[in-house]
């Protein structure tokens, strides 16, 4: 397969990189992606960054026909940026989309591992920090405990087997995103990642985890906030209650209400 046809065994791949004030990072991350997997394309989805990230991305796109830019009107959140990117990818005929942070916390050099898992039969691949071979660097202990504890709670509440449902480095076949109606996802932050994994899992797709190395950003400001964690906790709790209610109704021979799965 030639570079123009995409990554071997997966087809055309688009790496979506949402940005908001990532002027210090965008050149480096796009360069690393291009070096790691030259056959993939990159979409920078910029939320009208006041630091000029969008303009830098335009310069990169002008000099590299594998880089594209989606300019959005303002800061609408991570989930909305990815949903817009997914729609762009579908319109352009891509077979696979990859989620990747702009700050370098997700190593582009590990991207072949995610794509190879798709080639080997997975429908969706979660880059995972908490399996053998995975690791986290430069996180304070309280952050690591919150992440670990949150993932344990997600497994208990939703019954998903995944060790790391909140991670943001992952790859999906476009057919999966079409089937789970990704356009109706309203979550942001970590809960957005949980919801996508939950929908894919509930719809019977083969979702696998591969180990990744997560390194906290060295440049720029983190977008993490307490509200993101609170949203995740609330939504996961509601989804878990609804899932158990639907299981009970099924056992009683009653049909769960349509449209009640996602708050």
Regions found by a protein language model. Give the residues of each.
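Cell-envelope/extracellular polymer assembly enzymes that use nucleotide-activated donors
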Residues: 12-14, 41, 195
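N-proximal low-complexity "stem/linker" segments adjacent to membrane-targeting elements
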Residues: 1-32
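Acidic helix N-cap motif at the loop->helix transition within catalytic regions
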Residues: 24-28, 51-60
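Short beta-strand/loop segment that forms part of the nucleotide-sugar
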Residues: 30, 39-49, 70-71, 100
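Residue-level signature of catalytic and energy-coupling elements of molecular machines
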Residues: 26, 33, 85, 103, ...
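Hydrophobic helical membrane-anchoring modules
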Residues: 1-10, 159-160, 182-263
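A conserved acidic beta->alpha catalytic loop
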Residues: 46-56, 74, 104
